[in-house]
Each structure stands twice: as C-alpha cells, then as structure tokens.
C-alpha cells in the first residue's frame, strides 16, 4: 500500500488532463478510506477530515489524492495540501486542461493603411464644433429671459449665451450658475453691424435707444463708444452730393412757387396792419412790397400744408391706412422695409465710391515707367560725333538741344566739341548752311563766345580722334 501511494504522483503527472469520470470517482473513494485509517491511528481527526474533504473536492487531481492518502500524520497532510493547491492553480492557468488553438480564438487585425489614417485625421480637423442646437422642451419665454439675464448681468451676447446653454444640455439653472465663472470676449463689430449702425444713425441721429432697436445685441454704452470712434473716420459728404442736393432743393422750390402762383387764393395773402398807412405810395413801389409779402406767405403755407421734402401720400395708402389699425401698421412696416433697403443700397454705393476714390488718390505715379538717366561720358565715339554734326546742322548753336539729342554729353562738352573738332568736321560750313537756311538774326548763341574749358576736355586720345575724323570726313564729303 505505501509503495502504490508513492507512485501515485508520477502516474497522475503522466495522465494529467486525461482522467475520466470513473477514475476520478475511484480515486476519491480510496483517498477517503486512507484518510479515515490515518485519522484513527494518529488520533488527529480534524487534520484527517480536512485532508479527506480537500481530496474529495478535487477529484481530477491525482497528486492530491495520492499525497492525502500517504500522509501518516498531520504534518505530512499539510505538506501534501500545499503541493496539491499549487498543482491545481497551475492547471487553471493552463486553461483547464489545454490551449485554445484555432481561428476562432485569433484576433482579426486589419491591414495598415496610412492613406486611410491621414484621411480620418483630416476629417476630424475639418469637423466644426456645434455650439447651439434648439430644444423643444425650452419655451421661447424662458429662452428670452435667460438671454436677457446673460446680457444685462454678465455681458454675454446672444451667441455666447446660447453656447453656454448648449454646453449644459439646455439646463437653464446650470447655465445661469456657470455664467459668472467666465469672462465673455470683448464686443466685436462686424461689417454688417457697422453698416446697420450707419443706416440707423442716418435715420435717427444720436437717438441711441432707437438705434438699439436695429442692433438689439449692442448695449447703449457700446453704441456710444462706437459712435465716437466712428465719427472720426467717416468721410464727409462730397461736393457732388451737396451740389445735387442743392439743385434738387431749388427745383422743388421752383415747382412749389409755380403751384402757389397758379392756384393761390387772394385771401391767403397776409397784410401787415402797420403798412396800411402806406397806401398813398406810387404804384411803381408797391409791386416789390406785395411780392415780398407773397413770398413770405407762400413759405409759411408751404411749411404748413406740404409734407417734408421727398415724402408724398398716395390715395391707395390712405385708404388702406383708414381701413383698420392692423392695415395701417402693415403699410407702415412695408414702407419702413422699403426705406431700409433703399438706404442700404445707397450706403453700399457710397462705400464703393469711397473705395474707388481712395484708389484714384494714388495717381498714376506707381504705374509710370522710370526715367532712364544717362551719365555723361567724356569720350566721343564715332556715332556720337556724327550725331553731334547732324545736330549742329539742325539746331545751330543751341547747345542745350544738341546735348539733349546726344543724351550723354553736357552743354560744356558740346561747346568743347565745337572748338576741338571745328576744322576736322568743317563745323563753320555747317553753321553757315544753318544760318543761310534760318537767317543770321535767328542765331541762338554768340558766335564769338569762347567755351569754358572743363577738365574733361583735356582728355584726348590722338589715335581715336584721327580715326574718327577720317571716317567722318569721308562720310560728310560723300553726303555733301
């Protein structure tokens, strides 16, 4: 019996993982009987009972059964319990009797696609951030009250207040509690806000509470601050606009005078009682007095009876306004909308004109080609000498004109050319031809005046002068 018990661990180690239900049951029974005999001989009932219970609880472990049966006393039973527990834990780590092999246990790893990864990152970058989405659970009254509190107490505009509300998932209480924790961005004026302010200012002037009706997002303090920064940069009315306005005013006044003269009533003429004593004045002097009174009465009647300039009343509008109160408000609203649209067009046209004027103020200087300034050269080439002789034939002693024709020679150098090359190019004969053609009285320079010699005239190259003189003598002789 002891020998068989010692071989138990080896056998159980070789057959690990392949025990059947029958072998497990027989092993459990033998282990229980061995534990009972050991407990009776040693007198340690508690230790043997614990060993038997552990052996019965693990029927698949042959090592536990053999060690528990071979324990002669309590100490050996405790050692066999520790070894059996380590074996069972190793079996559990190995998956309860085998490895999980097969395609059903493998993870599906996709292929690496860098283009797809870059596309996903680009899509994430291009996605915008949602800052507001309406919710049906919120009523318009609560939403307006929340926006008003955010504007008045904390300085938020409508977009910032709605963004805070959307961040807290449309919870007004949390949003109101979180509003003091942040400082809103400074008030910024967009192009549309500036255009609306200019239109409202043209309508209402400095009545800022009426301007605020067209810009409800702006406070009166913000409107006043923007007004003082805007009025310094706005362009004044052009002369053309003032002239057109003046002509229109004169035309309207002439039309009003014609209407008053054609359909005037003598009763409308007001006569000052203090002037009744002047009835004995000759009739030649009464005409301008009556005309003056007539003009004054016409101005008073026109101011009383006619609407402001540019305004008129149509019969259809009067009938629609007199029908009921709602129709009157509708007509007035339509007229206001038309007026606003027309003034917007005017403002856009003025802005376009001002931009074009700014472009015209620069002039054409940036587009002008730069003038090429030639430096004066002391040496006379063959072409320059021939050109100088031809210029003398055309302009005579006009040294400035000859200098301009040559381009790179000053007036002093041209005078020195007269002296140095007088004999070689027969300049005297050329001057005689010019005088015969234009007359001696039209000579434009003193013939006896000696030219001022400059340091540049002292530079002479004999070989070049002889060569140029020979070439020009041949050309001039053939031409003559």
Swiss-Prot record:
Keywords: Chromatin regulator, Coiled coil, Isopeptide bond, Nucleus, Phosphoprotein, Repeat, Repressor, Transcription, Transcription regulation, Ubl conjugation. Residues 238-265, 328-363 form a coiled coil. Expressed in the external germinal layer (EGL) and internal granular layer (IGL) of the cerebellum and in Purkinje cells (at protein level). Residues 272-282 have a biased composition (Basic and acidic residues). Pfam families: ELM2, Myb_DNA-binding, REST_helical. GO terms for molecular function: chromatin binding; enzyme binding; transcription corepressor activity. Residues 1-105, 238-308, 436-466 are annotated as: Disordered. The modification Phosphoserine is found at residues 121, 254, 454. Residues 21-58, 66-89 have a biased composition (Low complexity). GO terms for cellular component: DNA repair complex; nucleoplasm; transcription repressor complex. SMART domains: ELM2, SANT. The keyword Cell membrane does not apply. Residues 97-183 form the ELM2 domain. Belongs to the CoREST family. The SANT domains may bridge the nucleosomal substrates and the demethylase KDM1A. Component of a BHC histone deacetylase complex that contains HDAC1, HDAC2, HMG20B/BRAF35, KDM1A, RCOR1/CoREST and PHF21A/BHC80. The BHC complex may also contain ZMYM2, ZNF217, ZMYM3, GSE1 and GTF2I. Interacts with REST. Interacts with the SMARCE1/BAF57, suggesting that the BHC complex may recruit the ATP-dependent chromatin-remodeling SWI-SNF complex. Interacts directly with GFI1 and GFI1B in a RCOR/GFI/KDM1A/HDAC complex. Interacts with INMS1. Interacts with SOX2. Essential component of the BHC complex, a corepressor complex that represses transcription of neuron-specific genes in non-neuronal cells. The BHC complex is recruited at RE1/NRSE sites by REST and acts by deacetylating and demethylating specific sites on histones, thereby acting as a chromatin modifier. In the BHC complex, it serves as a molecular beacon for the recruitment of molecular machinery, including MeCP2 and SUV39H1, that imposes silencing across a chromosomal interval. This is REST corepressor 1. It comes from Mus musculus. The lineage of its organism: Eukaryota, Metazoa, Chordata, Craniata, Vertebrata. The gene is Rcor1.
